[in-house]
C-alpha cells in the first residue's frame, strides 16, 4: 500500500506492506526526512490537530495492518530537530551499536528473542536525563495556585479548648491535653470520621519526616510521583530496553494499598439545577448523559487544610448517548469553552455522567447497580478518570518534578441502595494514574476488577512494555492480612479515593439567570441553540430594545449563553471579558459600560435583523 506522510517539511510517500511493523516503516521514513531530526520526538497522528497522537517509538512493534491504515491514507507527522552536530560526528556509531545488539532469549523477560525488526528506531546518543524530569529547586520556579499558596502559609493546627478534668493550669496556660493538634492527627480524624487526609495535611506529615530544619540539613522536596516505566538512558551502559535492563532502570515491584490522602476533599454544586438538567435529558430519552464540570477550587473548612471543588456550570460536549453508555465525539470548541471559563474566573475541575436505569415501578425509583457487593466505579471508568487526571496535573513546589497528582474529580449520578437518585464523587489514586500511563493495567469485562497486562501479548506492542510485579494486601478467611499477587486481576477499590459532595445551605451561584438558555448539543431531543433564543433570553423586543420583563444584567448570567455568544464572533476579546464580568459579578456599572461598546451595538443590530 502507498501511505502519505505530511509534516513540517512537506509531504512524502512510502510504499509499505500490511504486515510490516512501524519500526520498519520508521526506518524508511527517516531516510526521507531531515538528517538532524530527533527520532525520539517523531509522532504520528490521524489529524493535523486535535487527533490521536502516538510516538513512533511507542508503536514500533505494532503492524501497519493493526492500526487500520489503508492504501492512500494520509498520516500527519511532527518532530523536533537536533542541534547541528560538529564535523566528524554522525549517527553511524549509534546505528552500528543497534545492529550489534544481542538478540538472545535472555534479553526478553518472557524468554522470547528480540528480533531485529522489533528494535526501536535508531536514535543518536544523548546526555543522561531523568525520565521523571526532575526540576532543580522547584520551589523557585513552579507557579502554584493562589489557593495552594494561602494554605501553605497556614499552620493547619487544630485548636482545642481547656479540658476541665485533665488540665491543671489557668485559662492562659497550655498542656498536652489542650495544645493544638497537628492537621494529620489520627485520633482527631477518627473522631470526625475523616477517612482520608487532605493533601496539605499529608504534605505537612511527610515534610515533617523528610525535612528537619533543626538538624541544619538542606531542603528536599518531600513529594515524589510514582514512576513505573523503565528509565531511559541508564548510566550502567547496557543496551536500552527491550534489549537490556538492570536494577537501576527497571521499576520496583508495586504493592497496592488504599491512598491515605486525597487531592480534593469535597465537591460542591453551586445550585441543584446543574444536576437536574442532566436528569431532564435522561428522563426524556432514557439515555445517559456526560458533562464537564467548570468551577473553581476553594478552601474546605470541614477538614483540616481541606480543598473543595465548587461547580458553577456543566458543559455537555458532542456525544452519542445510549441506554448503557456514552461515546464522546470530537469537541471542536473545547479551547473556546475553556477560554470562556477562564474569563469567568473558572477552570475545568472534573467530569460527571449519569448511570441510571428506571425500575419500572412507576414511582420514580431507579435500579441500584453500584453497591458494596458489586462496584462503585468500574475498571473502564477508572482508566478513563486516570487519563483525565494525567491530563490535568497539579503544579506544586513541594514535588521534585514540579507536579503531583491532580485536582480533577469524577462524579457519577446513579441510584443509591434505596432506589433514589444520588451523586457519588471520586478520584483515582496517583498509583492508578501512573499504572494506566505506563500501560500496566487494562479494564476488564468484569467491572469490579482491573487486569494486569502480560508482557508477552501477541496482539499489541507489549514487547516494549516492562510489567513489574504487582501485589496487594487483603484480609483472608482467617482474619489475617496476607499479600496476594495481582496477576491476572485485582479489585478496583485499591485504585479509588472517595470524596464527599453536597450543595451549599445558602446558595450564591455565579450564574443567576432566571430563564436558562438552551443547553448545547441536545438536538437529539429537539433542542437547538438559535440566535432568536438569544433575543428572548435577553428580553429584547423586535426593535432590539429591552422590554419591561427583561432581567437586566442577570439575563446574561448563563454559561451556555456566554459560550454561544462567543461562538458568534461578534464581540472583541475585551468586550467578551466585560460581558463575562457582568454575567458573574452582576454589577450594573459594568452592564452600562457593556451597552456603550460598539461590539454590543452590532450584536443588538444582528439580533434585531434576525427577528
From Swiss-Prot:
Example of a GO biological process term: ubiquitin-dependent protein catabolic process
Low complexity biased stretches: 90-106
Residue stretches making up the MPN domain: 267-404
UniProt topology in membrane: Peripheral membrane protein
UniProt keyword list: Cytoplasm, Endoplasmic reticulum, Membrane, mRNA transport, Nucleus, Protein transport, Translocation, Transport
Annotated segments matching region Disordered: 89-113
An annotated GO cellular component: nuclear membrane
Location of this chain's protein in the cell: Cytoplasm, Perinuclear region; Endoplasmic reticulum membrane; Nucleus membrane
Pfam families assigned to the protein according to its UniProt record, in alphabetical order: NPL4 (PF05021), zf-NPL4 (PF05020)
Domain of life: Eukaryota
GO-annotated molecular function: ubiquitin binding; ubiquitin protein ligase binding
SS bonds (residue pairs): none
Major localization listed first in the record, in broad terms: cytoplasm
Keyword ATP-binding: no
Biological function: Involved in the import of nuclear-targeted proteins into the nucleus and the export of poly(A) RNA out of the nucleus. Has a role in the endoplasmic reticulum-associated degradation (ERAD) pathway.
Family: Belongs to the NPL4 family.
Protein name as catalogued: Nuclear protein localization protein 4
Source organism of this protein record: Sclerotinia sclerotiorum (strain ATCC 18683 / 1980 / Ss-1) (White mold)
Lineage: Eukaryota, Fungi, Dikarya, Ascomycota, Pezizomycotina
Amino acid at each position: 500500500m502507498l501511505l502519505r506522510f505530511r509534516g513540517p517539511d512537506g509531504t512524502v510517500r512510502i510504499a509499505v506492506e500490511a504486515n510490516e511493523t512501524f519500526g520498519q516503516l520508521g526506518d524508511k521514513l527517516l531516510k526521507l526526512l531531515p538528517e538532524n531530526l530527533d527520532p525520539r520526538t517523531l509522532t504520528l497522528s490521524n489529524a493535523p490537530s486535535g487527533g490521536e497522537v502516538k510516538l513512533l517509538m511507542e508503536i514500533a512493534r505494532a503492524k501497519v495492518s493493526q492500526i487500520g491504515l489503508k492504501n492512500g491514507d494520509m498520516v500527519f507527522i511532527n518532530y523536533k530537530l537536533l542541534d547541528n552536530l560538529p564535523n566528524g560526528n554522525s549517527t553511524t556509531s549509534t546505528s552500528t551499536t543497534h545492529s550489534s545488539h544481542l538478540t538472545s532469549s535472555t534479553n526478553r523477560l518472557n524468554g522470547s528473542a528480540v528480533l531485529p525488526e522489533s528494535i526501536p528506531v535508531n536514535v543518536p546518543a544523548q546526555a543522561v536525563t531523568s525520565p521523571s524530569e526532575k526540576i532543580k529547586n522547584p520551589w523557585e520556579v513552579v507557579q502554584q495556585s493562589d489557593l495552594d499558596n494561602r494554605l501553605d502559609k497556614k499552620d493547619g493546627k487544630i485548636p482545642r479548648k481547656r479540658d476541665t478534668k485533665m488540665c491543671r493550669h489557668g485559662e492562659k496556660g497550655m498542656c498536652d491535653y489542650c495544645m493544638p493538634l497537628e492537621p494529620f492527627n489520627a485520633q482527631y480524624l477518627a473522631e470526625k470520621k475523616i477517612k482520608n487526609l487532605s493533601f496539605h495535611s499529608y504534605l505537612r506529615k511527610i515534610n515533617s519526616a523528610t525535612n528537619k530544619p533543626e538538624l541544619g540539613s538542606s531542603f528536599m522536596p518531600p513529594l515524589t510521583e510514582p514512576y513505573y516505566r523503565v528509565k531511559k538512558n541508564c548510566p550502567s551502559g547496557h543496551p536500552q530496553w527491550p534489549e537490556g535492563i538492570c536494577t537501576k532502570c527497571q521499576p520496583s515491584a508495586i504493592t497496592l494499598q488504599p491512598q491515605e490522602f486525597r487531592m480534593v476533599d469535597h465537591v460542591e454544586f453551586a445550585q441543584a439545577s446543574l444536576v437536574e438538567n442532566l436528569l431532564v435529558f435522561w428522563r426524556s430519552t432514557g439515555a445517559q448523559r456526560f458533562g464537564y464540570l467548570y468551577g473553581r477550587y476553594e478552601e474546605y473548612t470541614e477538614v483540616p487544610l481541606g480543598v473543595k471543588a465548587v461547580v458553577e456550570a456543566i458543559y455537555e460536549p458532542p456525544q452519542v448517548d445510549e441506554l448503557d453508555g456514552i461515546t464522546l465525539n470530537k469537541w471542536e470548541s473545547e479551547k473556546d469553552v475553556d477560554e470562556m471559563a477562564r474569563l469567568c474566573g473558572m477552570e475545568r475541575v472534573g467530569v460527571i455522567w449519569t448511570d441510571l436505569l428506571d425500575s419500572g415501578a412507576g414511582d420514580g425509583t431507579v435500579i441500584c447497580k453500584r453497591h458494596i457487593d458489586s462496584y462503585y466505579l468500574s475498571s473502564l471508568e477508572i482508566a478513563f478518570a486516570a487519563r483525565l487526571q494525567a491530563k490535568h496535573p497539579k503544579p506544586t513546589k513541594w514535588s521534585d518534578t514540579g507536579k503531583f497528582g491532580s485536582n480533577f474529580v469524577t462524579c457519577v449520578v446513579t441510584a443509591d441502595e434505596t432506589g433514589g437518585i444520588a451523586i457519588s464523587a471520586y478520584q483515582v489514586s496517583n498509583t492508578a494514574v501512573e499504572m494506566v500511563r505506563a500501560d500496566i493495567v487494562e479494564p476488564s469485562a468484569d467491572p469490579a476488577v482491573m487486569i494486569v497486562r502480560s508482557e508477552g501479548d501477541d496482539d499489541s506492542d507489549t514487547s516494549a512494555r516492562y510489567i513489574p510485579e504487582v501485589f496487594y494486601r487483603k484480609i483472608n478467611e482467617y482474619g489475617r492480612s496476607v499479600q496476594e499477587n495481582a496477576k491476572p486481576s485485582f479489585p478496583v477499590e485499591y485504585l479509588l479515593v472517595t470524596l464527599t459532595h453536597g450543595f451549599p445551605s445558602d446558595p450564591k451561584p455565579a450564574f443567576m439567570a432566571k430563564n436558562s438558555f438552551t443547553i448545547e448539543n441536545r438536538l437529539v431531543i429537539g433542542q437547538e441553540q438559535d440566535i432568536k433564543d438569544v433575543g428572548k433570553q435577553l428580553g429584547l423586543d423586535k426593535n432590539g430594545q429591552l422590554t419591561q420583563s427583561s432581567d437586566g444584567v442577570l439575563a446574561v448570567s448563563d454559561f451556555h449563553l456566554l459560550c454561544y455568544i462567543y461562538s458568534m464572533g461578534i464581540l472583541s476579546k475585551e468586550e467578551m471579558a466585560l460581558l463575562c464580568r457582568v454575567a458573574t459579578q452582576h454589577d450594573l456599572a459594568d452592564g452600562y459600560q457593556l451597552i456603550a461598546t460598539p461590539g454590543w451595538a452590532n450584536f443588538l443590530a444582528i439580533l434585531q435583523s434576525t427577528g
